[in-house]
C-alpha cells in the first residue's frame, strides 16, 4: 500500500493556493460524468489485457514504443474488474455523441481540467474495487512510479533537437494533481474538501516512498483527446506546448525504473533546458549540469527533488537547483545570465571592473616598509663590509707582526734572565693599529685576542672593552707586567717613560686618579701582581738608577746649600722617590717637555723639601702616621710664621722679611708633603675603590697651594686648637670662594679648608665644624638631636620646635647645654 502515488515532501512544502483554478468543476458530478469519452480506447485496451492475462503471464511492454499512450499497469485479473469495464463501456458509448457537443462549448482550459478530474475519479474507483479483492502471492502491486512510460529513447537519441524535447515535455508540465488526497474516500462528491486535505488517510499507513515523487505515465494526455487525433503513433512530437498561467510546473523525476541507466548521461542530456512559467521576470539558462560527486550520489539514491525558487528547503544541497526560468539560451544576453556551478564559480567569474586580483601584468610594488628597510640595510652592509676589508690588514701582515712581537718578547726574556732589564718600553708601540672607538663593536681588531678570564681575579678597577691588558699570549718564562699606557700616549722621551714605569713597578700600586686624569688619552687600567723573582730584580735595578740620579741631583743641591747659612742633612732615597712623584703629578701630560726641564722641576722640588727641614718618613709604607700629629705640626709652623711676620713688620729689616718668605715656602712644601704621605697611605690601604677620595684630596691640595700664595697680601692663618679633634677636612661652605679671595676685608683664614673670614672669632667658630664632637644637645622630649655649634641649636629650637628666644623652654635648653659644655 505504501508504494501508491502520494504527495511528495517537496510538493507538501509548497504553499497551498486555494485560488487556483485546477479544480474548477470538482463538485459538479453530473458534468464530470459527461466527460467519459477520453476513456473509450483506454477501456478497450484494458479488456484486451485482461484476456491475455487469463491465458499467460503478462509481459512488460517496451518503454520505447511510441504508438501507445502512457498506460496504467493492469491490475490483477478479477471478475469484478471485467464486469465493471463492460458496464462503463456501454455507458460511455451512449454518451459519446453528447460529449462531442459539449467539447465545443467549453474552453480548452476547462476541458483539460475536467479531463484530469475524470481520470482521477476513474483511478479511485479502480482502487476501491481492488481493496475488496484478495491478492495472491504471485500477483504483484506495481507502484505508479515504476509504471512510467516516459520515452527514455528520447534522452539518448542525438538526432532529436532541443526544441522537440521541449515540445514533448509540455504535456507533463501541464498536469497537476491535487495534494494531500485521502485514498479511502468513498464518494466522489467529497473528493476535494478542506478537511479531507488536512486530515491524513484513515485506512492506509502513513508512509511515503521517495521513488514516487512524480509520475506522469499513469495518465494519458488530456489535450490529445481534445484535439481528437486519430492515431497515437504521432505521440507527443506533433503536440505543441501550452504554458498555463498561475500553475506550478513540475520537473522530471528519475524513478526506480531508470536505475539501470547511467545517471550521468541522463543528467547531461535530459536536463539540458528546463522551462518555467513566466511568473517571474528574470531568467537564467543552464548550459550543462556540472557532474560531480553530489550529483552522482543523488542520482544513485533516486532522490532528485523538484527545484523551485519558492521552496523552503536548502537549495545548496540540490545540484540541479535553479531559479525560475522561462527563456531559452537563444534569447538576448542582456536578460539571461549563465548559471555558475560550484566547481567553476571561482575560476570563471571575471568582474568587469578593474581588480588586481587577476591582473597579471601589474608591477610588484615595494609597499612594505620592512622590505625597504632590509634593502637599505643590505646596501649599507655591503659598504661596511667593503670598508672593513680595506681597513683590516691582510693575513700576511698579521703573521709578520706576530712574529716580530714573539722575537721581541724572547729578547726581553733573555735580558731579564741576565739580571738587568735595560728597556721596558712598550714593544712595537709604533706598529700597532689604531683603535677606532666608534667602529669597535662592528669591526673588532683581529690582532687583539680575546681577554683571558683568569685576569679578572686580580682586577682592581673596571676595564673598558677597548682596554685589552694583553696583546698576545706571552711565553711561559716571561710573566705579564703592567705597563703605563698614559706615558706612552703622551710621547715623552724614553728615559722619562722608563723611569716612571720603573717606579710604578717598584711601588706595585694601582693607578691613582691623579695619574690617570692628568691628560692621559686612555682610561685607568688595572695592574697585576708580579712574581717575586722579577720584583726583586726590578727593585735592584731601580735602586741603582736612583743612586745615579741622586748623585747627579746632589751636585745641584750642594750649589744651593752654599748660599744658605744652615746646612741641611742629606735626604733619604725614599724621600727622593716621593718628591719625584710629586713632580710627575704637577706635570701635565699635554705639554711636551724635554728631559732637562724635568730635571729642573725635580731639583726645585728637592730644594723646597730641604728648606722645610728633615722629614721622618715611613720607608716601609705601613701607614702608621696619623692625621692629628701631622696637622699639629702644620699648625705650629704656621704660628711661627705669624710671629715672625709680626716681628718683620715691626723692625722693618730686610733679613727678617727674607726669613719670613722662607718660612712661608717651607710651610707650602710641608703641606704638600703631608698630603702626599696621606695619599700614598690611602692608596696602600685601599683596594682601588677610593678613587673619588683621592681626587678630592688632590684637589684640596691644589687649592691649598693656590691659597698659600695669597699669604703675601697680609692674610692671617688661625692656628688649630690643641683640644680640637679634627675629623672633617672639608666641610660644606655656603660662601663663594671667589668672593672670599677677592674680598680684602677677609684676612683671617682657616688652616684646614683655607676659608676666609673677617674676624678670628669667626674662624674659631668655623673650626668646630671640622670636628665630629657635638656637645650641644636638644633637650626637648623625643628629640635629642646634637649640634657642634650653639647657634645651630638655636636655629633648631626656633624652626623645628617653634620656640622663640626668651621663652622658658628655650632658655632652659641653652642653660643645660652651658653646664654640659
UniProtKB/Swiss-Prot annotation:
It is found in: Nucleus; Cytoplasm. Residues 222-245, 319-329, 422-432 have a biased composition (Polar residues). Its main location: nucleus. Residues 545-561, 694-714 have a biased composition (Acidic residues). Gene3D superfamilies: Classic Zinc Finger. Disruption phenotype: Leads to sensitivity to caspofungin and affects expression of many genes including caspofungin-responsive genes. Results in hyphal defect during C.elegans infection and exhibits attenuated virulence in flies and mice models for candidiasis. Decreases the expression levels of a set of ergosterol biosynthesis genes, such as ERG2, ERG3, ERG5, ERG6, ERG11, and ERG24, resulting in the accumulation of lanosterol and zymosterol. Impairs maintenance of the yeast form under non-hypha-inducing conditions. Leads to increases susceptibility to fluconazole. Keywords: Cell adhesion, Cytoplasm, Metal-binding, Nucleus, Phosphoprotein, Repeat, Transcription, Transcription regulation, Virulence, Zinc, Zinc-finger. PROSITE patterns: ZINC_FINGER_C2H2_1, ZINC_FINGER_C2H2_2. Residues 372-387 have a biased composition (Basic residues). Phosphorylation at Ser-769 and probably additional serine residues. GLC7 dephosphorylates CAS5 in response to cell wall stress which leads to its translocation to the nucleus. One of its GO terms (biological process) is regulation of transcription by RNA polymerase II. GO terms for cellular component: cytoplasm; nucleus. One of its GO terms (molecular function) is zinc ion binding. Transmembrane segments: none annotated. Changing residue 769 to E: Leads to hypersensitivity to caspofungin. Residues 305-318, 396-412, 662-674, 684-693 have a biased composition (Low complexity). This is Cell wall integrity transcriptional regulator CAS5. It comes from Candida albicans (strain SC5314 / ATCC MYA-2876).
